């Protein structure tokens, strides 16, 4: 091959006499021709027989890039004949910062430097070969402007170029640099051995150096100029050849580097979606806040949404999960379980999901060389025999398919919508569009850059079973050889991946592919508004390949023609892939009328997951109408038509979820969302259990199981620590259906503990007017035995769903929602309901307050953490804890067992409330009334109620605890004694002179709190023994009887008005009317006063329990309930309602139905040194939701009472009354 050499020229040849016709151009006068694309200009003269060149100035080193060859760099060696010929030039001086008058990327400076610079001699180009050098022939090639020297930059600015100041090595001399320019890109450029050789070997066909043969190759990266030519340069690129500067590189390493570069753009060139990040989404409004996550409405950013799309950007829900909170609260598994469950519900096949972004050879952007074969795109239509041809709007193949196959019918949404086209063999589908009548297909071509592919509009896909011999693949006929399996075929066919426009051939070239085409063929596919695509089932190799061109197989496995053994040097490393399906893999079934096995409209869909250093992100489908629970609260309850519609959608979704091996285990209205069409979507699979479809459920009672779910909807087998099955979701479905119709859960109690007892006893009551079919279905579902609960098939065929057509359930419009059996509160607005009850449980505007069957404690109770912040086993389980369930099960199974140990109860261990010291002390006989009640009922009483129905249907958490744990149920302990007269006092009532001295007598005081009698004429009053057991209705009769005795006193006091609301043996210490406001502790420091709820008139009562009661009197809501601001309430003219003490009294509560307990705060007793008891782990204030934590003065006439769940702002009428209250509270315990 011809080559040219730089070298020292002889005086005769290097200094020819100047010609008058062609003036000699020296280096400082060389300028660029604006019409040339080259940065060098040369002029030749032939005064002798040899071809010689005028000295040429190389480009300055500051403008060298990674594409600049070493041969083009200047040298610091000077010519010996520099003094003879004045051909030297200088470069501008260095400016501040080392930029020698020539910016890094800016235009060149035309000014000469002022400082003296070293003089350099440009090398001479001498052609020693008969074949001219490409550089010498550039002048003739500029006319056509069709070829340019590789490495030149069209953006290089015009003007003079200068050399910058260079580092001078000690070994530098004035001898010009000897440079060899080779035409062969495979030349080794060895200056020591081959510089004087005029012959060069021919370049091989598989030269790794890019560039066309016969032209200069792409220049390499610059090397250090001060190094000797024989030294080892620092080459930053692999494109300089196999051996550069003595550094030998192997062909295998060269191929690895090339493969590494190809894998960087493989994802973009194959159409695979890149990994999402937060920058890909535009955050909108906040949809909701959970315990460890926040949900936002997001839309794709501009770079991921096609601006030419006729539809607006689709909205999604982005769930942001705090990783630090997950780790701290030990809830990492909930996020992982939710992700895995949603993936299974979207793509439930046992095989691996689609591998996004895999760096396979089928998606590489560069052509393979050598044995890898050539790549051909499925979008190409040029004369390849193996490619499908396009003619007259038909894509056809020369071979016929004689096998069973599946067809895809794709209907475009518009005339300009892209459609799918098919290629021969088993290649991937490539989205293209048909334009014009010439058959030219325009669409996405194989990309060679890292730019994201053009988005393709969603298509509506419908799968049809083709004929056996390949005819009429779209008619939907079944073949006689294979029975149509809906789940299997839909499951297999909807598996998809982003289409790859590049197809890979085998290592043997195109022969293997040709054999594949001969073995399988494809029917013609017509292009139009609706096209039919034919995919023959590919051959499944014995060893599935994790890399290469995945194929769509009929059994859900991906196949490939090659194995890693065929291409060992091209197989990249495995990468972590997302199992979430692509958007085009699952289509909406609402337009086709058929349900896809890969998705269900009743389940929220997971689109992608990603994370950063602080959070996890789940991209979910958007449910714009919020939770179904808020709709129930808004309307009070659902009408029977809406309840039937949403219950049918719920049970249909449960059938799908269970068929995919997922048990939700936390089904409730809060986890049921409504989309824009008012159809349900089940969400929050963090508590789900994932099992195989055919996996038998093994009951391993010795295994420690986690309690998950919500207290109102948990099944009895879960409470008993048994294995959770699909029957647990059926139980929850029955509870949800009950709440749809009745407006509240069937087993809700004041605490989780009471709720568990109701569930275990199956204490459910149906309101009047409930639909009989609904009542029958709920009663059948709520069976304590899981095996006796009905199946989903039975539920669907129940008469309650007789009017429901499940085949069109998800396509018919949703019925309008109206109120059912329970009307919404008149004073409650939607804005207040959507605030998540931030104003508290006891507000006058609570849901159901005006209703007769209203339940005050509608807020879920969260189990508190123990003192000290310690996290024990089971403490981080959601909404209810292990100990409450175990205690409830134990008390139901052993009703006669008493857990009372002493006067102080360990709240964290035994879940018992605080109680006075006298409650468990002493034994004695019971009163006459109690004995008559026992004799009438024939059994012992089991509990004590404070009269929830007699007090207006209200319950408190404390009274519920007392009823459940058999308060006073250990050891007899009656109390008798004659009370003395009541002396008037400003602040605290003085104790009377007690005459009862029996073993059951009540002590005179406890912890400094005096005891009081009931007034003159009260006679003796006995207390039920601690070992006694009495039912709630008997306790209410006793309470009303005692209330009647109080009302018949000769001198009634104001205290007697509130005694029906008190517990047995509980006395009032201090009371007065107040104006009450409530707020959440989390909001008290952030909300201004005008945003707080309106103040309410209440009666504040302090008892010797000790506790504070906020009582509402409906009859005196507009007036002064107490009529006195003295605080003691000892007015002789006290208001007494007709009917007396409640025996035979009219209205709710036996004449006291107007009184309601709206709030309660308990002073937790501390352990005393006299008894030697101590508070163990889990006790203290944090273990009681309504325990008084602090009491502070606020303003001149107010004070605040703070509990873990509520802050009470109490305002009295005078400063003196506030002082009395503070003194009474401090005497009690603070």
Swiss-Prot record:
Disruption phenotype: Cell integrity defects. Decreases virulence in a moth infection model. Decreases virulence in a mouse systemic infection model. Decreases cell population growth in macrophages. Abnormal sphingolipid metabolism. Sensitive to: high temperature; osmotic stress; sodium dodecyl sulfate; Congo Red; caffeine; sirolimus; Calcofluor White; amphotericin B; fluconazole; OSU-03012; hydrogen peroxide; diamide; sodium nitrite; myriocin (phytosphingosine biosynthesis inhibitor); aureobasidin A (inositol-containing sphingolipid biosynthesis inhibitor); phytosphingosine; OSU-03012 and fluconazole. Residues 535-544 have a biased composition (Pro residues). Residues 77-87, 185-202, 252-262, 466-494, 502-521, 555-569, 927-942 have a biased composition (Basic and acidic residues). CDD domains: STKc_PDK1. Residues 62-76, 107-117, 140-175, 217-226, 378-397, 408-433 have a biased composition (Polar residues). Residues 1138-1152 have a biased composition (Gly residues). It catalyses: L-seryl-[protein] + ATP = O-phospho-L-seryl-[protein] + ADP + H(+); L-threonyl-[protein] + ATP = O-phospho-L-threonyl-[protein] + ADP + H(+). One of its GO terms (biological process) is intracellular signal transduction. Residues 1-277, 345-522, 534-597, 850-871, 907-955, 972-1035, 1116-1152 are annotated as: Disordered. The keyword Nucleotide-binding applies. It comes from the Eukaryota. Signal peptide: none annotated. Residues 34-50, 977-992, 1002-1030, 1120-1137 have a biased composition (Low complexity). The active site is at 666 (proton acceptor). Residues 281-801 form the Protein kinase domain. ATP binds at residues 291-293, 319, 621-623, 627, 670, 684. One of its GO terms (molecular function) is ATP binding. Keywords: ATP-binding, Kinase, Nucleotide-binding, Serine/threonine-protein kinase, Transferase. Residues 850-859 have a biased composition (Acidic residues). Its EC number is 2.7.11.1. InterPro entries: Kinase-like_dom_sf, PDPK1, Prot_kinase_dom, Ser/Thr_kinase_AS, Ser_Thr_kinase_AGC. PANTHER family: 3-PHOSPHOINOSITIDE-DEPENDENT PROTEIN KINASE 1-RELATED, SERINE/THREONINE-PROTEIN KINASE. Belongs to the protein kinase superfamily. AGC Ser/Thr protein kinase family. PDPK1 subfamily. The protein kinase domain contains a 228 residue insertion between the ATP binding site and the active site. Serine/threonine-protein kinase that functions in the sphingolipid-mediated signaling pathway, regulating organization of the plasma membrane. May phosphorylate PKC1 to activate the cell integrity MAPK cascade during cell wall and membrane stress. May regulate sphingolipid metabolism upstream of YPK1. This is Serine/threonine-protein kinase PDK1. It comes from Cryptococcus neoformans var. grubii serotype A (strain H99 / ATCC 208821 / CBS 10515 / FGSC 9487) (Filobasidiella neoformans var. grubii).
């Amino acid at each position: 091959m011809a080559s040219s050499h730089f070298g020292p020229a002889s005086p005769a040849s290097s200094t020819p006499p100047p010609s008058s016709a062609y003036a000699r151009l020296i280096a400082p006068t060389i300028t660029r021709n604006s019409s040339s694309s080259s940065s060098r200009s040369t002029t030749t003269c032939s005064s002798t027989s040899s071809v010689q060149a005028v000295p040429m100035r190389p480009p300055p080193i500051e403008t060298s890039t990674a594409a600049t060859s070493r041969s083009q760099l200047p040298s610091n060696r000077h010519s010996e004949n520099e003094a003879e010929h004045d051909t030297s030039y200088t470069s501008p001086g260095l400016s501040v910062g080392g930029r020698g008058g020539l910016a890094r990327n800016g235009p060149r400076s035309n000014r000469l430097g002022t400082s003296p610079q070293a003089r350099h001699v440009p090398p001479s180009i001498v052609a020693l070969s008969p074949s001219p050098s490409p550089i010498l022939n550039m002048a003739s090639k500029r006319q056509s402007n069709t070829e340019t020297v590789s490495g030149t930059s069209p953006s290089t600015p015009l003007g003079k170029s200068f050399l910058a100041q260079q580092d001078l090595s000690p070994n530098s001399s004035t001898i010009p640099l000897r440079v060899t320019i080779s035409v062969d890109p495979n030349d080794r450029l060895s200056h020591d051995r081959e510089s004087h050789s005029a012959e060069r070997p021919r370049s091989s066909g598989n030269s790794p150096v890019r560039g066309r043969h016969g032209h200069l190759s792409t220049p390499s990266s610059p090397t250090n100029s001060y190094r000797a030519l024989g030294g080892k340069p620092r080459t930053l690129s692999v494109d300089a050849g196999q051996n550069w500067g003595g550094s030998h590189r192997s062909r295998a390493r060269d191929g690895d580097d090339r493969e590494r570069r190809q894998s960087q753009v493989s994802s973009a060139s194959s159409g695979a979606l890149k990994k999402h990040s937060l920058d890909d989404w535009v955050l909108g409004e906040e949809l909701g806040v959970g315990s460890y996550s926040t949900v936002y409405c997001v839309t794709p950013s501009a770079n991921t949404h096609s601006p030419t799309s006729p539809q607006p950007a689709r909205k999604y829900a982005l769930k942001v999960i705090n990783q630090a909170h997950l780790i701290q609260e030990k809830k990492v598994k909930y996020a992982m379980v939710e992700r895995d469950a949603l993936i299974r519900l979207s793509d439930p096949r046992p095989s691996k999901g689609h591998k996004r972004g895999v760096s396979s050879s089928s998606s590489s952007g560069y052509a393979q060389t050598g044995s890898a074969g050539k790549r051909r795109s499925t979008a190409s239509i040029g004369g390849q025999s193996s490619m499908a041809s396009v003619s007259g709007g038909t894509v056809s193949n020369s071979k016929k398919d004689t096998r069973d196959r599946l067809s895809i019918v794709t209907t475009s949404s518009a005339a300009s919508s892209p459609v799918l086209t098919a290629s021969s063999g088993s290649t991937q589908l490539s989205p293209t569009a048909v334009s014009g009548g010439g058959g030219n297909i325009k669409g996405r071509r194989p990309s060679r850059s890292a730019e994201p592919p053009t988005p393709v509009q969603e298509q509506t896909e419908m799968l049809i079973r083709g004929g056996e011999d390949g005819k009429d693949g779209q008619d939907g006929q079944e073949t006689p050889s294979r029975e149509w399996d809906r789940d299997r075929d839909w499951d297999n066919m909807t598996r998809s991946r982003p289409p790859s426009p590049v197809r890979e051939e085998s290592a043997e070239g195109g022969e293997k592919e040709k054999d594949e085409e001969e073995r399988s063929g494809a029917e013609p596919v017509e292009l139009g508004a609706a096209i039919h695509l034919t995919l023959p089932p590919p051959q499944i190799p014995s060893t599935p390949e994790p890399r290469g061109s995945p194929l769509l197989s009929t059994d859900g496995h991906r196949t490939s023609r090659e194995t890693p053994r065929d291409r060992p040097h091209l197989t990249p490393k495995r990468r972590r892939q997302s199992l979430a399906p692509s958007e085009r893999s699952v289509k909406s079934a609402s337009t086709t009328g058929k349900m896809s096995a890969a998705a269900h409209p009743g389940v929220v869909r997971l689109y992608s997951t990603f994370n950063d250093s602080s959070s996890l992100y789940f991209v979910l489908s958007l449910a714009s109408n919020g939770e179904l629970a808020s709709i129930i609260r808004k309307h009070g309850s659902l009408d029977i038509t809406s309840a039937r519609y949403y219950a049918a959608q719920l049970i249909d979704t449960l059938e799908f979820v269970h068929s995919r091996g997922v048990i939700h285990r936390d089904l409730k209205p809060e986890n049921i969302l409504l989309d824009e069409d008012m159809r349900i979507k089940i969400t929050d699979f963090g508590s789900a259990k994932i099992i195989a479809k055919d996996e038998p459920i093994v009951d391993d009672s010795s295994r420690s199981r986690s309690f998950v779910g919500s207290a109102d909807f948990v099944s009895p087998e879960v409470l008993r620590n048994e294995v959770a099955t699909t029957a647990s979701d059926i139980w929850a479905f029955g509870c949800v259906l009950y709440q749809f119709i009745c407006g509240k859960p069937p087993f809700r109690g004041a605490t989780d503990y009471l709720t568990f007892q109701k569930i275990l006893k199956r204490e459910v009551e149906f309101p009047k007017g409930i639909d009989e079919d609904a009542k029958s279905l709920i009663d059948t579902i709520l069976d304590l035995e899981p095996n006796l609960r009905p199946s989903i098939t039975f539920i669907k065929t129940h008469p309650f769903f007789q009017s429901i057509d499940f085949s069109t359930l998800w396509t018919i419009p949703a019925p309008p929602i109206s109120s059912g059996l329970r009307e919404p509160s008149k004073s409650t607005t939607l804005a207040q309901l959507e605030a998540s009850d931030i104003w508290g449980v006891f507000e006058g505007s609570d849901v159901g307050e005006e209703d007769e069957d209203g339940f005050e404690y509608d807020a879920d109770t969260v189990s508190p953490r123990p003192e000290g912040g310690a996290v024990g086993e089971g403490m981080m389980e959601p909404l209810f804890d292990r100990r409450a369930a175990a205690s409830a099960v134990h008390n139901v199974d052993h009703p006669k067992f008493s857990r009372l140990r002493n006067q102080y109860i360990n709240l964290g261990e035994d879940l018992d409330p605080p109680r006075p010291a006298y409650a468990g002390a002493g034994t004695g006989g019971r009163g006459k009334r109690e004995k008559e009640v026992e004799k009438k009922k024939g059994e012992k009483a089991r509990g004590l109620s404070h009269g929830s129905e007699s007090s207006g249907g209200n319950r408190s958490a404390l009274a519920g605890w007392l009823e459940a744990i058999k308060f006073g149920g250990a050891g007899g302990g009656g109390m008798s004694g004659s009370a003395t007269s009541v002396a008037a006092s400003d602040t605290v009532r003085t104790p009377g002179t007690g005459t009862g001295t029996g073993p059951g007598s009540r002590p005179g005081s406890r912890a400094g709190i005096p005891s009081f009698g009931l007034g003159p004429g009260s006679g003796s009053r006995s207390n039920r023994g601690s070992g006694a057991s009495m039912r709630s209705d008997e306790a209410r009769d006793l309470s009303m009887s005692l209330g009647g005795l109080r009302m018949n006193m000769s001198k009634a006091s104001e205290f007697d008005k509130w005694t029906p609301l008190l517990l047995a043996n509980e006395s009032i210490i201090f009371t007065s009317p107040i104006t009450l406001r409530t707020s959440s502790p989390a909001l008290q420091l952030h909300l201004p006063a005008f945003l707080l709820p309106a103040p309410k008139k209440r009666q504040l009562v302090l008892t010797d329990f000790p506790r504070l009661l906020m009582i509402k009197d409906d009859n005196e809501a507009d007036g002064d309930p107490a009529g006195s601001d003295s605080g003691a309430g000892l007015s002789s003219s006290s208001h007494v309602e007709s009917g007396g003490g409640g025996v035979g009294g009219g209205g709710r509560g036996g004449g006291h139905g107007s009184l309601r307990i709206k709030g309660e705060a308990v002073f937790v007793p501390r352990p005393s040194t006299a008894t030697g008891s101590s508070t163990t782990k889990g006790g203290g204030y944090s273990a009681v939701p309504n325990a008084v934590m602090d009491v502070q003065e606020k303003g001149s006439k107010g004070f605040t009472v703070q509990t873990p769940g509520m802050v009470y702002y109490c305002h009295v009428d005078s400063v003196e009354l506030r002082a009395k209250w503070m003194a009474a509270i401090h005497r009690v315990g603070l």
